[in-house]
């Protein structure tokens, strides 16, 4: 294959995953509007399932009391909700703080990683639905009712994720919120047409009969949805189930967080059957190819497009790359500054994806985890 053809292929795949796929999803949503799955209504007048809300925590003393209080304030029958804090090797007083705050069950576990803590908590409870949340994520009062509604509406639903909004109390932005809005639009349409291709750790739930233990180095966010779809379950989004989470204050910090996340993600991509379409519906396979496979291939595709591009286009790419790596580009006034900040965010995230792969191949991926700096604020109460 000649260089021009290689360039067109790489550029075309990048254009498809970034622009073409979202447009195709939007068109499919419109064409299938009458056939797409209706969003389930809230379930106040239905028999509500029992729910165990599991909060894995490592060194979360400063925020765990606020999180437990937030869980207790959810608009869900108290007799059907069990709040569990699964402490993963916390030596900072997190277990004691969780007990004082009123958690129903506090597990003081040896250090084993987030997934091990979650699995242990699931094994020690018996609710119909198992919900999960991070210690620094605060749910809206009706979030749990909204999260369980799809399980009630359809017995084929095995996984449901909600929506998390990233906030910065200081008023700044690391661009994660803007990217996340784009991601949420894709997820909403994927859910309506088939199933989501990934979730989030801030707000999600699994039907107990669908729950599977995954490798401790593979997080639920990426691994569970496509695994459960392969088992015949639906993995949906509940748009009305909302949570907020404090973002990392700056783009550089967000890039460092993404690099750590990508080290875990590459474990799933390469060793967690994410590239194996067997058992998936054809539509879901196309979604995984467009949204996930190409997303992780993007850094390599960018490199191929750069090397094989015509000279003038290569010069433009290098100019844009150089500008994006200059912090000042995001501080320019007006639309130019906003565009520069988004470009910088995109380039740094591509870099984080590539470096995450390097970290995974060089060092492997550990099950341990730590809260990213700047995403926790001490509870004054």
What are the functions of these language-model segments?
Residues 52, 60, 70, 84-95, ...:
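A conserved acidic beta->alpha catalytic loop
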Residues 110, 115-117, 121, 127, ...:
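Long helical/loop segments within the catalytic core of UDP-sugar-dependent glycosyltransferases
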Residues 1-43, 191, 321-327, 352:
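N-terminal membrane-anchoring/stem segments of glycan-assembly enzymes
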Residues 69-80:
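Short, acidic, metal-binding catalytic loop of nucleotide-sugar glycosyltransferases
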Residues 151, 155-183, 216, 220-288, ...:
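Catalytic donor/gating beta->alpha subdomain of glycosyltransferases that bind UDP-sugars
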Residues 35-43, 257-321, 339-342, 364-381:
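Basic/Trp-rich segment in TM-proximal cytosolic loops or flexible interdomain/linker regions
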Residues 130:
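Short aromatic/hydrophobic "clamp" motif used to bind/position activated sugar donors
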Residues 62-66, 91-100, 142:
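Acidic helix N-cap motif at the loop->helix transition within catalytic regions
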């Amino acid at each position: 294959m000649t260089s021009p053809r290689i360039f067109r292929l790489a550029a075309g795949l990048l254009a498809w995953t970034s622009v073409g796929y979202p447009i195709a999803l939007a068109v499919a949503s419109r064409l299938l509007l009458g056939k797409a799955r209706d969003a389930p209504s809230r379930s106040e007048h239905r028999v509500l399932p029992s729910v165990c809300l599991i909060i894995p925590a490592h060194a979360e003393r400063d925020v765990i009391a606020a999180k437990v209080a937030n869980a207790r304030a959810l608009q869900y029958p108290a007799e059907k909700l069990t709040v569990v804090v699964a402490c993963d090797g916390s030596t900072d007083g997190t277990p004691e703080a969780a007990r004082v705050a009123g958690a129903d069950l506090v597990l003081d576990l040896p250090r084993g990683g987030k997934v091990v803590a979650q699995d242990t908590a699931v094994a020690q409870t018996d609710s119909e639905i198992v919900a999960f949340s991070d210690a620094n994520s605060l749910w809206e009062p009706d979030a749990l009712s909204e999260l369980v509604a799809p399980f009630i509406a359809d017995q084929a639903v095995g996984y449901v994720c909600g929506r998390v909004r990233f906030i910065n109390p200081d008023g700044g932005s690391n661009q994660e919120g803007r990217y996340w809005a784009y991601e949420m639009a894709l997820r909403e349409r994927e859910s309506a047409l088939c199933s989501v291709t990934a979730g989030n750790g801030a707000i999600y739930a699994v039907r107990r009969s669908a729950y599977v233990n995954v490798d401790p180095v593979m997080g639920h966010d990426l691994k569970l949805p496509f695994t459960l779809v392969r088992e015949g379950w639906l993995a949906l989004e509940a748009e009305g189930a909302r949570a907020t989470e404090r973002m990392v204050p700056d783009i550089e910090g967000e890039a460092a967080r993404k690099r750590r996340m990508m080290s875990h993600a590459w474990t799933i991509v390469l060793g967690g059957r994410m590239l194996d379409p067997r058992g998936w519906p054809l539509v879901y396979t196309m979604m995984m190819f467009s949204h996930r496979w190409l997303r992780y291939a993007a850094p390599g595709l960018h490199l191929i497009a750069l090397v094989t591009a015509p000279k003038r286009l290569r010069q433009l790419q290098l100019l844009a790359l150089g500008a994006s790596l200059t912090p000042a580009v995001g501080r320019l006034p007006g639309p130019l500054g906003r565009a520069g900040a988004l470009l910088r965010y995109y380039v740094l995230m591509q870099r984080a994806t590539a470096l995450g792969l390097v970290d995974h191949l060089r060092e492997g991926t550990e099950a341990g985890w730590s809260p990213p700096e700047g995403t926790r604020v001490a509870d004054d109460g």
